[in-house]
Amino acid sequence: MAAAKKAVLGPLVGAVDQGTSSTRFLVFNSKTAELLSHHQVEIKQEFPREGWVEQDPKEILQSVYECIEKTCEKLGQLNIDISNIKAIGVSNQRETTVVWDKVTGEPLYNAVVWLDLRTQSTVENLSKRIPGNNNFVKSKTGLPLSTYFSAVKLRWLLDNVKKVQEAVEENRALFGTIDSWLIWSLTGGIHGGVHCTDVTNASRTMLFNIHSLEWDKELCEFFGIPMEILPNVRSSSEIYGLMKISHSLKAGALEGVPISGCLGDQSAALVGQMCFQDGQAKNTYGTGCFLLCNTGHKCVFSEHGLLTTVAYKLGRDKPVYYALEGSVAIAGAVIRWLRDNLGIIKSSEEIEKLAKEVGTSYGCYFVPAFSGLYAPYWEPSARGIICGLTQFTNKCHIAFAALEAVCFQTREILDAMNRDCGIPLSHLQVDGGMTSNKILMQLQADILYIPVVKPSMPETTALGAAMAAGAAEGVGVWSLEPEDLSAVTMERFEPQINAEESEIRYSTWKKAVMKSIGWVTTQSPESGDPSIFCSLPLGFFIVSSMVMLIGARYISGIP
């Protein structure tokens, strides 16, 4: 029997999409942008202490190998020749910090995830050293001093992890965000691996000057970071190195394929949504929620709590584009919390069913400030609250309130962006895993009171990385010229409530947010003395209650 004929599809491009919750490898047809096959692996998060969030860098790397291998197997089953994969792009969770040993290839500590809060006291101490009239950190980086970004995570590792300290002293340490760790490992690791990052990921470290597009000596001195451990900064679209066979990757079919695209996940989604024009914006619903608006070649500094960041630089000789960004820490993560911590759902998909049963939160509001509040508040003292509960409230109302919370947070950052840009968005382009939830998308349209537009192919983050890789000089299989970009079919959600009702719900949400702020300081019980009496009002209440109880027993004659 003759072997099945391989399908001829033209050049293919692969994309590693390494997120906070999962890793995926996807393969696209570079001529049509069609997704041909993919594989996904969920990634564990570790919570060793209150407010700490870590991941195992080796597990992340192994998940990439597994996804590549399984996707190649699936392509084989479809009779698609994997030798047609001409390039690979990488998109990644940003800010998450890894330090590893370049001699052994071993991570020196777990990856400290972007959501992690352990550096709050470091941030407070550093903020005292910034002159009030000269915030050089924000003017150079576009970022507020926050636990969110890599510099303070790296500072914590240098201060607290002996292995990291020793490796730095012995010139064995390399630092990187997840993209750097993956590219170094995939291009050979200890056998000539390429230590690099791209401008979008570098711009999230708080060590990178977004004007000069270089590591900044003054910033490195301020945070006490040795510059020799930093990766080389490259554009988002160029050949960084070639795939090398690993003992962890059974099939060596992708050996020699160039890794030629790299963008932080939110920049990748901006490219994948084809927001190449000044003023175009997208909102990605993943573990967190991230609204980016392309501001062209101009750095626009927000007066309303948004970040200024590098959007992309698609080639060594191509211009840099900037973006305004509103970041929400907890979006999809609240669904995972309802599943793993409260146990009111068994799978993420169940939340849509629960919310649909009631169609309202019945006055229940959920502020999921598990890692403080990001834009537009930048308030690390906030913690999650559920308020407006009655005896009637059940798990369906809480599920609905959780979805509403994602939409309310998006409304806050959209309002801030409209004020900064001066021109309100007429519609919102969306992407990310949560957009498959139709209840969420309709709620978002109702709360914003503008249409929400969702592409039929939701994998825009991976698509953006693939586009950057395929368009790189020396690869040239993907044209980014407007006339060559494939048209994308869209699903549209129109507002279905009146504007007055939308405003009432939003203003009540804002009241709930105010109640979530001020719960924690670095001197609070969660980081210090666990004694109940470190809360003076509570201690006084307990003591006075005991005195009253003893007095009552005495007066009534009870022995």
Swiss-Prot record:
Belongs to the FGGY kinase family. It is an enzyme of class 2 (transferase). One of its GO terms (biological process) is glycerol-3-phosphate biosynthetic process. Coiled coil: none annotated. Keywords: ATP-binding, Cytoplasm, Glycerol metabolism, Kinase, Membrane, Metal-binding, Mitochondrion, Mitochondrion outer membrane, Nucleotide-binding, Nucleus, Transferase, Transmembrane, Transmembrane helix, Zinc. It comes from Mus musculus. It is a single-pass membrane protein. ATP binds at residues 20-22, 287, 332, 433. This is Glycerol kinase. PANTHER family: GLYCEROL KINASE (PTHR10196:SF56), SUGAR KINASE (PTHR10196). ADP binds at residues 20, 24, 287, 332, 433, 437. Zn(2+) binds at residue 501.
